[in-house]
Amino acid sequence: MCLIVFAWRPGHAQPLIVAANRDEFYARPSLPLAQWPEAPQVHAGRDLEAGGTWLGLGANGRFAALTNIRDPHRPPGRRSRGELVAGFLTKDVPIDDYLDDVVARAPEYGGFNLLIGNANEMWHFNARESEAVMLPPGIYGLSNAGLDTPWPKLLRAKAALGEVLDDPQPQSLLALLGDSQQAPFADLPDTGVGLATETLLSSVFIASQSYGTRASTALIVQADGSRHLVERSFGPFGGHLGEVDIRL
């Protein structure tokens, strides 16, 4: 997952609203959003190369999502970061205990941001800072850096999310995730990947021959605990592959 914007507002009619894009190489095998046969409490996509996932729902209102932190100068981790999301969704352990385990194991992974929560609390963990923070109500954004790093695409996506919060619908969340406008050269971050790649990665929705947005996900959680999750899948150059709509 490479871009997540979300509104966390406990006590509201919709306490959690999430719009997220997963960016990945098209050649990496994966499955779309579905109920997991071996863990029926989990609804998520699946990375078939390593077995984990990037965003999903579990029992008792559990939610988890992850973005990688871009740093080409650091070696890749020994373990797949997607197992951190899968682990939280498949296990029934308290959030504090799970975060303690994540903190202890973080050096085994490449850089990442992890969001985990339920109906009552939402936590963010940044592996570079090795600190877990309980989030107060607000509108937040994550890409391939720290929480709310003001990259152009994150600012655009957060602003677009704010405009639909009065009447959030999956289609409006998916629409904001389809923004393909690239940032001007002067506004690009420098993450060490070169100007051409920085430009490609600067849009909310990324499309190219080999790498791009593979899945766009909209999640709306209601105060009664019901959840509506919609995922669109894409192939090379942004070709639409399908859509999954799940109500829980």
Regions found by a protein language model. Give the residues of each.
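N-terminal nucleophile
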Residues: M1-L248
